[in-house]
Amino acid sequence: ARNLYTEQTVAELTAMLAHPKVIATGETGLDYYWTKNEGNALDWQRARFRTHIAAAKQTRKPLIIHTRNAKDDTIAIMREEKADEIGGVMHCFTEDVAMAKAALDLGFYISFSGIVSFKNAKVVHETAAYVPMDRLLIETDSPYLAPVPHRGQQNEPAYVRHVAQAIADLKGMR
């Protein structure tokens, strides 16, 4: 097995993305939640993210981007690397309206998971209410992040209806 920390080149990723069954690039992005910058771990993440964007653009396979505790760097890199040329989805989105606006301006869709149904997820509630319906997606992120009323259980695709209901409630839809 390959070491997870082995650097993949754009050429290697492009070759993998060229497979006809591959329809998107990712999940990629930045997650600073658990990472300290020991051994330049953040630099490593940023470099890999840039590599993934380059490969996505070369193969015309949209990006599936995850970001956690890294919104400024994520948007900066998306802009610098011209991710708007390929577009994609901001997966399991938990950031604020400002970041959603920036991602929408770059042509990305915003996807919400079961977190949007959590009472304490006020920032996610505000963001879901803001995102236009034609740019909003729902997901399970299964087996994690089961929505209320299944919070704490293993998530499954059937629960996505609770994500949809939570968003409909936030948008005042009946």
Model-derived segments and spans:
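Mid-domain alpha/beta scaffold segments of enzyme catalytic cores
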Residues: 1-174
